[in-house]
Structure formats: structure tokens, C-alpha cells
């Protein structure tokens, strides 16, 4: 407990020093609490003292201090894994299909994580006899972290210990998901896409236990069916329209609004429309029912 408290104090002090320096250059006086600080950052964006991307990143940096790994992890059901007894060709099939670079390796089931496989470690075997491949030759130690770990501490650990994936466990020692450094960076800079990412035509995609990415063009009817909600589609047909209607204007990326207990955050937008939103469902809500 003392370690967490001392770290929290150091984190708060370092943040206060950074933001005090920044805000002293932009404003007269210092904010007295978090809400005032957020308001000043947003005002600075609206007044064009800082650009939109900088504003979003500053908000993201503040957000990660309030979140736990459980809030951002890839849930167990969404984990793509390899089995310890799989052949080289079987591993390559999974790697090519998923386009991921790191995989938990399991034995019996997802509660039995044997280690982590990095796709690049298979390259030497592709130039020689595939029969020489053995998972034991490429298996790396899996880092295990609790669900309750603070996200800012997780990021610091990723950077200092130079690894990119950790297995998340619950209080009983069962595997509840995994977290990557990319998951944390996306909280700060927005969704990161690479040359392997295809344009997403999936309406609903789970990011963590309570957070989903929603295409703005997804229909309100489909959203209601999946999430058990009762949003009206009398005036607007899509989730993007619902969110814009609630704001009363075209919101910028990073703006957040609460609609009947569901928190909608604009993840992508341009000068004409909302493209994608993140929605956080209430903690006591059942998991959405999606068609396979």
C-alpha cells in the first residue's frame, strides 16, 4: 500500500509541476482542481492557444491516471492465442489471419498461459527445416499483472522494462484478459492504425469489458437490439446522429457526453460528420448480444 501511495504522490506532484508550467504560460493563475484544469485545457483548444491534437493528448494523459488495467484490457474472450503443441504451419496460419505480432501461448486453456510468442521469432525456422521448430525454442516469459494496476504505472513499466504485452489476472488468479502498450497509447493519442489495418466495417467492436467502439453509421435500432437500450430513432437513424443531437452541435474528437447512463466519446470525426465513437456501458449492464 505504501508503494502505491508514494507513487501516487510522486505522480501527482510531477503532473502538477508540468501543468503548472504549461498553464502559467497560457493563463493567469493555476487551476484549483481537476475540473478547472480540464476546463482550461479545453478552453485553450477552443481559443486556438493549443491545437486540437495537443488538447486531446493532454486530456488523455490525465485520463490514464484515473483508470485501471481492467478498464482497457482486451477481455479473455477476445484473446487470440496459440497452443504450445502447435506446429510451425499452424502458428503461421493464426499469425497471418490475425495480423498480430505477439501471442499468449496456452497449454490446456486460457487459464494456463505458458508464455508469449513473438511472430518475428519464427522467421529463422521459415528459412530452414520446419521440423526443427519447437515452441520451447521461441517461448518468452509472460508478464502477469493484476486487474487493479493503475494504467499510468503499467505504461511506466512497459517503457522501463521494455516489453509490450502483459497477461491480466483477477483476484482469484484466473486470466481475465491482456493489455498491450498500444492499448495505453491509444488512450492518449487516439486509435493507432498501421498498414495492415483495413477500413473497419464492423458496427460494434469490444475494446474492454465495458468499452466498445461503435461506427457512427450503425443504426440506433441495431444498437438497441445489441445493448438492450431504448434510444429513440424517431428523429435520427444512426448512433452518430444520436450523439450529434445530444451535443446540439458537431462535436470534435475527444468530446464526451452522457446519454441515459451511457458515456459516448467521439473517437473520430471530420469537419462534416462523426465517424466513430467509443461508448462506455454502465458497470451493471449485461454484455451486449451480437450476431455471430
From Swiss-Prot:
Listed InterPro entries: CBS_dom (IPR000644), CBS_dom_sf (IPR046342), CorC_N (IPR054115), FAD-bd_PCMH-like_sf (IPR036318), FAD-bd_PCMH_sub2 (IPR016169), Ion_transp-like_CBS (IPR044751), Transptr-assoc_dom (IPR005170)
Keyword Repeat listed: yes
GO MF: flavin adenine dinucleotide binding
Domain CBS: 73-133, 135-195
NCBIfam families on file: PRK15094.1
Function in brief: Plays a role in the transport of magnesium and cobalt ions.
Protein name: Magnesium and cobalt efflux protein CorC
Organism: Salmonella typhimurium (strain LT2 / SGSC1412 / ATCC 700720)
Gene from which the chain derives: corC
Amino acid at each position: 500500500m505504501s508503494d502505491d501511495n508514494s507513487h501516487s504522490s510522486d505522480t501527482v506532484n510531477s503532473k502538477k509541476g508540468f501543468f503548472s508550467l504549461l498553464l502559467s504560460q497560457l493563463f493567469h493563475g493555476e487551476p484549483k482542481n481537476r475540473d478547472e484544469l480540464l476546463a482550461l485545457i479545453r478552453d485553450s483548444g477552443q481559443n486556438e492557444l493549443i491545437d486540437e491534437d495537443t488538447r486531446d493528448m493532454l486530456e488523455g494523459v490525465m485520463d490514464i491516471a484515473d483508470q485501471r488495467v481492467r478498464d482497457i484490457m482486451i477481455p479473455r474472450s477476445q484473446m487470440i492465442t496459440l497452443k504450445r503443441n502447435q506446429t510451425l504451419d499452424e502458428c503461421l496460419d493464426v499469425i497471418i489471419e490475425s495480423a498480430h505480432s505477439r501471442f499468449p501461448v496456452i497449454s490446456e486453456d486460457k487459464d494456463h498461459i505458458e508464455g508469449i510468442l513473438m511472430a518475428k521469432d519464427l522467421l529463422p525456422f521459415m528459412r530452414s527445416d520446419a521440423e526443427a521448430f519447437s515452441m520451447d525454442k521461441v517461448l518468452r516469459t509472460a508478464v502477469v499483472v493484476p486487474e487493479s494496476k493503475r494504467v499510468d504505472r503499467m505504461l511506466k513499466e512497459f517503457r522501463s522494462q521494455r516489453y509490450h504485452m502483459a497477461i491480466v489476472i483477477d483476484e482469484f488468479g484466473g486470466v481475465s484478459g491482456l493489455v498491450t502498450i498500444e492499448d495505453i497509447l491509444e488512450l492518449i493519442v487516439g486509435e493507432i492504425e498501421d498498414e495492415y489495418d483495413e477500413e473497419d466495417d464492423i458496427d460494434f467492436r469490444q475494446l474492454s469489458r465495458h468499452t466498445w467502439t461503435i461506427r457512427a453509421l450503425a443504426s440506433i435500432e441495431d444498437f438497441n437490439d445489441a445493448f438492450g437500450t431504448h434510444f429513440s430513432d424517431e428523429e435520427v437513424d444512426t448512433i452518430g446522429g444520436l450523439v450529434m443531437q445530444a451535443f446540439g452541435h458537431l462535436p470534435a474528437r475527444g468530446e464526451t457526453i452522457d446519454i441515459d447512463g451511457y458515456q459516448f466519446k467521439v473517437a473520430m470525426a471530420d469537419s462534416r460528420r462523426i465517424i466513430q465513437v467509443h461508448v462506455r456501458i454502465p458497470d451493471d449492464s449485461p454484455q451486449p448480444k451480437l450476431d455471430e
